[in-house]
Design a protein with these regions (language model features):
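Multi-pass membrane proteins that catalyze or facilitate reactions on polyprenyl-/lipid-phosphate substrates
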Residues: 1-266
Length: 266
């Protein structure tokens, strides 16, 4: 029964993490509905996020390898053909800074004082944000992005520290509002996920190592991580496909319905 519970929650995390529907909001809702001790386990969050991170790294492995290679090649040669990815690497850094700095200060406050009713309200906000960009196409490609664009998108990511505000949704909205193409906005959103996820994992690894239950829960943790990774991979591909078709309205409707129900119930 315990393994099944971890498996189900791993699947939920994996499905909601890359989609613009807020994984943190959904986990908070399930915690309120079922009062599960699993959802109060910070080690669980670290483990399943690691599974999701691995999935995104695999999905974008060619893009990531190209960015890293071109970054160092530009430093070495200064050749123009490497300059786009060199700049893009710095754009990722700039976009990460706002959430990385503010996250350290507000994380504990949010965990303690953010109610499930507020999660419902934030899901409605996510719905409105997604609705606002449903018809926007944008013109700017990766090579056209500016540091101001990166900063603006990074500030949208700060808002997503609130449970119920989707990180991927907020950053895609920020990108689309900066006139990026759908593909460019989505790719940059996933690139921003990587350093934020790594930082969160590093901050929590000490607690994971010193946890008294790590040995007894090793198998449930492993199962939830694998489940989260596999489902994240295919959910991310689904998001990419839906973005290409310009069908963000589906996610907007979903977030509005779930948010309204949660707001009324709690």
């Amino acid at each position: 029964m315990l393994i099944l519970k971890y498996l189900i929650l791993g699947i939920i995390q994996g499905f909601t993490e890359p989609l613009p529907i807020s994984s943190s909001g959904h986990l908070r809702i399930f915690k309120s509905l079922f009062n599960s001790e699993v959802l109060s386990d910070m080690n669980f969050e670290i483990i399943v996020n690691f599974g999701s991170l691995i999935a995104i790294l695999i999905l974008y492995r060619k893009e990531i390898a190209s960015i890293i290679k071109d970054f160092f090649m530009f430093i070495k040669t200064k050749e123009k053909k490497y300059s786009v990815n060199y700049k893009y690497a710095w754009l990722i850094v700039v976009g990460t800074i706002p959430a990385a700095l503010l996250g350290l200060f507000v994380k504990d406050f949010i965990e303690e004082y953010f109610t499930t009713k507020l999660v419902g309200l934030m899901l409605i906000v996510t719905s409105i944000l997604l609705f606002m960009i449903k018809d926007i196409k944008g013109k700017k490609e990766k090579k056209d992005m500016t540091y101001l664009d990166a900063l603006k998108i990074g500030l949208f990511q700060v808002v997503a520290l609130l449970p119920g505000i989707s990180r991927s949704g907020a950053t895609v909205v920020g990108g689309m509002k900066s006139n990026l193409t759908r593909e460019t906005a989505l790719n940059y959103s996933f690139m921003l996920y990587i350093p934020i996820s790594v930082a969160s994992m590093v901050l929590g690894v000490k607690d994971l190592i010193t946890a008294g239950n790590i040995a007894t829960l090793a198998i449930p943790y492993l199962i939830s991580m694998i489940a989260a990774g596999i489902v994240t991979y295919y959910a991310a591909k689904l998001f990419i496909d839906i973005m290409k078709k310009g069908k963000l309205i589906y996610f907007s409707i979903y977030c509005f319905i779930v948010g309204l129900v949660v707001f009324i119930i709690f």
